[in-house]
UniProtKB/Swiss-Prot annotation:
GO terms for molecular function: argininosuccinate synthase activity; ATP binding. Pfam families: Arginosuc_syn_C, Arginosuc_synth. It comes from Paraburkholderia xenovorans (strain LB400). SUPFAM superfamilies: Adenine nucleotide alpha hydrolases-like, Argininosuccinate synthetase, C-terminal domain. This is Argininosuccinate synthase.
Length: 408
């Protein structure tokens, strides 16, 4: 332990990471640097600075940074270029935030001369893997302190007792038993885990949802959006250009208004267990549908199918924490290359929990009306050619059937 003189802690200002801060001081006798990232969680972050100061952190060792634009531009948008979904439903809202936090922690460790980094992820979840794979990929020699795998504070009561003994300010909600759910939020989504959600037979309570109205209570009038795309990324809504963070914020607002993006999911964690979570991803749900819409007229068929084949692998890499791996980076180069001609606009309809594409157009379109028409195409397509195409593709099946008959 003596070789660790300074450690950078991913710090939220909440009970868990405040206890970790004090525990690091007590058990490692190390100078603690706190890093708090604004990635759109919607919380006031200055209280984290105040609490860190109360716990003896030097002002120059407190880092609070607005990373919302970088988060959407460099992490969310690249992921959505691949139409990424984990296990058919999950849009990876938590998974995609961890690589950015890990990256910035390592940068701060280099800048401050820290020998170690620390996080508040438990020993049961995926986040410990995501953080630490990122740390080691970006700084191979870094030391990692994961308190939940070291200490004996394995219950809420023990955490509260430690906090009280150490003089850590305790919010009233923790004294009264804590929040009903374990929640994680950023610009892409908000997640809910724990408490009665740990019983997969129990339906989520109606008052749990924060960002979306129920589809039944959504407006009776549908709303239409024209979303403009450049190189696979959304850049404007109804003619108004928006920054990446502004884009996702506005789509969240519009999607939430129409009850879009709710998900109740049992997923397979990388560490081996099944876990239930509920998610609200209104803006991401709209982006996924719209992106598929613009790709439908701008991507070559085989390129589109190749992307579909690779997507589950790409999604698993992100979910499991391999954002900074060579294979994810290689896949990203391919994905980004496919997006060069993904330009144009998509019209989507928002109505009572659903989002559907109703129109799309592009200067790069591969949709040829003269060939696709059911009317006279003026010779653009010779239907007689289809006969030879079919016979050649049927050849192997005809040979197989003839062989079967000969064998009796």
């Amino acid at each position: 332990m003596s070789d660790i003189k300074k450690v950078v802690l991913a710090y939220s200002g909440g009970l868990d990471t405040s206890v970790i801060l004090k525990w690091l001081q007590d058990n490692y006798d190390a100078e603690v640097v706190t890093f708090t990232a604004d990635i759109g969680q919607g919380e006031e972050l200055e209280p984290a600075r105040k609490k860190a100061l109360q716990l003896g952190i030097k002002p120059e060792n407190i880092f609070i940074e607005d990373l919302r634009e970088e988060f959407v531009r460099d992490f969310v948008f690249p992921m959505f270029r691949a139409n990424t979904i984990y296990e058919g439903e999950y849009l990876l809202g938590t998974s995609i935030a961890r690589p950015l936090i890990a990256k910035r922690q390592i940068e701060i460790a280099r800048a401050t001369g820290a020998q170690a980094v620390s996080h508040g992820a438990t020993g049961k979840g995926n986040d410990q893997v995501r953080f630490e794979l990122g740390y080691y990929a970006l700084e191979p020699g870094i030391k990692v302190i994961a308190p939940w795998r070291e200490w004996d504070l394995l219950s809420r009561e023990k955490l509260l007792a430690y906090a009280e003994k150490a003089g850590i300010p305790i919010e009233m909600k923790h004294k009264q038993g804590g929040a009903p759910y374990s929640m994680d939020a950023n610009l892409l989504h908000i997640s809910f885990e724990g408490r009665h959600l740990e019983d997969p037979k129990a339906e989520a309570e109606a008052d749990m949802w924060r960002w979306t109205v129920s589809p039944e209570e959504a407006p009776d009038q549908a709303e239409y959006l024209d979303i403009e795309y450049e190189h696979g990324d959304p850049v404007a809504i109804n003619g108004k250009r928006l920054s990446p963070a502004e884009m996702l914020t506005e789509l969240n607002r519009l999607g939430g208004k129409h009850g879009i993006g709710r998900l109740d999911l049992v997923e397979n964690r990388y560490v081996g267990m099944k876990s239930r979570g509920c998610y609200e991803t209104p803006g991401g749900t709209i982006m996924l549908k719209a992106h598929r819409g613009i790709e439908s007229i701008t991507l070559d068929r085989e390129v589109a199918h190749l992307k579909d084949d690779l997507m589950p692998r790409y999604a698993a890499l992100i979910y499991n924490g391999y954002w900074w791996s060579p294979e994810r980076r290689a896949l990203q180069v391919l994905i980004d290359h496919t997006q060069e001609k993904v330009n144009g606009w998509v019209r989507v309809k928002l109505y009572k929990g659903s989002v559907s594409v109703v129109a799309r157009d592009s200067k790069e379109t591969l949709f040829d009306k003269t060939i696709a028409t059911f009317d006279d195409d003026g010779g653009a397509y010779n239907q007689a050619d289809a006969g030879g195409f079919i016979k050649l593709n049927a050849l192997r099946m005809r040979i197989a059937e003839n062989a079967r008959r000969q064998r009796g």
